[in-house]
A protein has these predicted regions:
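N-terminal signal peptide c-region/cleavage motif recognized by signal peptidases
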Residues: 16-18
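N-terminal cleavable signal peptides for secretion/export
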Residues: 20-59, 102-119, 226-232
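Short, surface-exposed coil-to-beta transition loops
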Residues: 44, 66-68, 125-133, 162-168
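An acidic-aromatic
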Residues: 51-109
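Short, flexible beta-strand-to-coil junctions
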Residues: 61-67, 120-121, 174, 182-188
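Extended beta-strand-rich segments in extracellular/periplasmic secretory proteins, especially
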Residues: 101-160
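Extended soluble regions of mature proteins
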Residues: 143-231
Length: 232
């Protein structure tokens, strides 16, 4: 499971004017390690900060509209905190969990079940129950990755199902983190959306495009949710 859902807005980017990209700089005391150009017209900046616990790492997501979200995971890829910069709401992991997500368990056994809570700074508590399974290996832009299948259900504190997500993702053993893939999500109203956040290019320091905040892929496509059962 992607450890921090991007929560990105749907974008219609037809006819947009290209903007000259500047190299993004992480906060003071932090080091930008990799820029990842993704499908769905998004680009991710992966960085680490000296003040954090060993193994913690951050990601900042950009669309054509700018910085939209940022998140921190730990060495086990647990959701430590996530901020939607459009709404301004931050969610944090409740450290008391029935079954924390564990990257080491997934890589050792091939599967990992999880059942944990997050709480927002507005007081909303959400329960997340799901599973990750390894399904094979793949190489994208020279980066060796394990492919995964995941399922995730998110419930309100009262026990109502709010959203169900199923799909495929990728995990890097070297980098210790997940990358998005193709997924289907259905909310409590029955509305279904299909998205593809798969990585396309992994860009390291010194390479062209490192730190760029301008997405390169799928930006001339109309990104819309498809109703269940198909339809125009």
């Amino acid at each position: 499971m992607r450890r921090m859902g991007q929560g990105l807005c749907l974008i219609i980017a037809l006819g947009t004017t290209p903007v000259l990209a500047a190299e993004w700089k992480p906060p003071q005391g932090c080091r930008l390690e990799m820029t990842v150009q993704q499908r769905s017209c998004t680009v991710a900046q992966h960085y680490r900060c000296q003040a954090d616990a060993p193994g913690d790492q951050w990601v900042a997501y950009f669309t054509q509209e700018g910085l939209v979200s940022q998140a921190r995971i730990d060495a086990e890829t647990r959701w430590m905190e996530s901020t939607d910069l459009v709404s301004g709401i931050t969610d944090r992991l409740d450290l008391e969990a029935r079954d924390h997500a564990s990257l080491s368990t997934l890589l050792k056994t091939g599967s990992d079940d999880f059942d944990f809570w997050t709480q927002s700074d507005t007081g909303e508590r959400l329960r997340h129950i799901g599973r990750d399974d390894l399904t094979g290996t793949v190489e994208i832009d020279g980066e060796p990755l394990d492919s995964t299948r995941f399922s995730l259900r998110t419930f309100s504190e009262a026990g109502d199902l709010l959203i169900e997500r199923n799909g495929t993702q990728f995990v890097s053993r070297d980098l210790g983190r997940f990358f998005g893939g193709v997924e289907t999500s259905t909310d409590w109203t029955g509305e279904t959306q299909e998205t593809d956040d798969s990585p396309v290019r992994f860009i390291r320091p010194g390479e062209p495009g490192f730190g760029s905040t301008t997405p390169d892929y799928d930006c001339n496509m109309q990104m819309v949710g498809m109703p269940a059962g198909g339809g125009a």
